Amino acid sequence: MRQSWGEQEMQFADPELSRVMNEKFGKLTLAKTRSIVNLPHVDFTPLNNLITGNNKVKSFEEIKHFTGLKRIFYLCDNCPNLGGTMTIPESVMEVGGRCFFNTQLIGIEFLAQNFKWGHGVIWRCTKLKWVKMHSIEVPQKNMPNNQYLFDFAIANNTWKLYVPDGSVEKYRADHNFANLGERIRPMSEFKE
């Protein structure tokens, strides 16, 4: 019997992530995945840090299917073995501080326009090679101040920020990204 659109079960490549998701949500279909607005904390409070501190999760590329998410805070905070890449859906309009703290991610892509971010988003991401931001206007901090640039305490000054071709100079002029200088590159130059 064929399943109707969206009723296919969501498959997670990482066994630990699959276990956590099954424990919190039961059977996750594609339709249910797309309707989730918050990913609950380990104690089921809606704090969006479902896998915080989990040292067994190694990938979460499936985040791209959670197209109903509005905000993510501490989502992968201190997941020291989380690697690969993540594409954050365009529905996510706020990315909280420490969201990817102390991970082994090599790439993060933000699809949203005009999203907000918290300081320390990529703190201690020593393996990071690239970040792609599709926002034409420069994303701003959720708590405006002149402290804590986007790459605050990353301990890696080789990663590149890819932005829309027509927005490169806007990003280079913005206080929170100006320190990246020539590492801010046009999206058309991106090659994995």
What is each model feature region?
Residues 11-15, 19, 23, 182-185:
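Solvent-exposed adhesion/ligand-recognition segments of exported proteins
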Residues 1, 190-192:
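Short, solvent-exposed mixed-charge patches
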Residues 5-10, 29-42, 49, 53-71, ...:
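Structural signature of tandem-repeat unit edges
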Residues 144-153, 169-182:
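Short, aromatic/basic amphipathic alpha-helical patches
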